[in-house]
Structure formats: C-alpha cells, structure tokens
C-alpha cells in the first residue's frame, strides 16, 4: 500500500539497478510512444529507433527540465497514424512525397496507381492521363512503387509534425506544421518546441492551449526560426514552473 517516505531513495536505487527509472509523470517530457514502424507493411520510418533517440535525448536528457504541464510525444510510421500522433502534444509521422510529371504518363487503360491510392487523390483526366490532386494526397508513398512504368518517383522522405494535441475532458487535434522535415530538422524542432513551451507557457497550461493563446501562426513562425536557440541556456536556467502544473 505505497512506499514509506524513508524508503523512496532505496526503492529508486533498487529499480535503477534493474534497469528501470521512476518519475514519468509531472510537468516534464513524458516517455515516448510509437507504433511498430517499418515492422508494419505500411511503415515509412523506423519509429522504434527514432523513439529511442528522442527518449534518450529529451526524456532522459531533459528529465529535470520543468515545463508548464505534461509534454507527450507520439510517433507514427505512416499517415495511418495508428497511435494517433495528432492527439499528443508533439506528433510525428512518416512521409514519402511523390514526384510525378503527367508528361511521363503512358495513359494505361488500367492504371495501377489509382488502385493503390487510399485517399482517392489519383484520377484519370479527359485525355486519359493520370493526375494527382496534391490537396488530397497524404504522402503515404503507395503510388511511388505502383506504376508499371515507374512514372512516379520519390521526391522526399521525412517526417510530418503536429503541435498541441489534447485528448480527454477537452480535445484539440494537433496543428500540422507546414513541410516535411529531415531527421536533424525534426530533432531541432522538438528542442525548440520544448524551449518555447517552457519560456512562454503558463504553469498548468497544456501545450495546445499555449499555442492557441500565443497564436498558431506566431508560434510556428518562432518554431521554424532559430531565435529561441540563442536564449536556450537562459530559458533552461530560469526558475520557472517550480510549483503547480501537472498533477499526474
């Protein structure tokens, strides 16, 4: 029925010796959650490797950094988003952007690309040429290996990012940050995001509510610049969010 106060430190030492740690709650970066990534037939990125890297860099490395509230990171291997990255404070999912020139299309009577597109983003125009509606495309990459004449190539592979997802008593779907980001860009964005949240969030305020209060466009503009990195040490050293915040 609980651990007596005087046994807390011995308990921590005992489970640390077994390879476990305590302290996964409170106003801080939480343990990272991911899907199985490339083990799945739909997976575009190695989510487990990325999850481990983010875990070590931000959950362990920034474990003592106090934030206004919990900060959950979710990683999906593709746009199917089985673990619902958009409902996490910081969401990540794999992207494979198609590169296609309609002039390369042979006008096959039976288009193999249309058959595999889950978003109905591909269609045949009046001239019998396949077209891709970019407004419908979610960059799942299925089409890039579907054309029998290799008319569709991969323009870019990387990660999509969403900000400020909340689920529970109140809900907020994460806001998509424009662009597809490389591995290094992604890690930099996570770092800048945490710094901005620590600096500009109010104690007890969920990240998504901070983004809305600051202004989505304003926050994303700050996020995509490197100005906050010039204030990194100042932000980390500041006496912020010492009491209150997340209760679980």
Can you say where each PLM-predicted feature lies in the sequence?
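Small-residue-enriched alpha-helical segments and adjacent helix-cap loops
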Residues: 1-110, 116, 135-136
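Terminal amphipathic helices with adjacent charged low-complexity linkers/tails
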Residues: 4-11, 18, 214-227
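Generic secondary-structure signature for well-ordered alpha-helical cores
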Residues: 16, 20, 59-63, 119-122, ...
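Flexible, glycine/charged-enriched surface loops at secondary-structure junctions
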Residues: 22-27, 64-70, 199-213, 229-237
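Short beta-strand elements
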Residues: 89-94, 159-168
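Iron-sulfur cluster-binding cysteine motifs and their immediate structural context
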Residues: 110-132, 142-158
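A hydrophobic, small-residue-rich beta->alpha segment in the mid-to-C-terminal subdomain
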Residues: 167-202
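Long C-terminal interaction/binding lobes of large macromolecular proteins
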Residues: 221-248
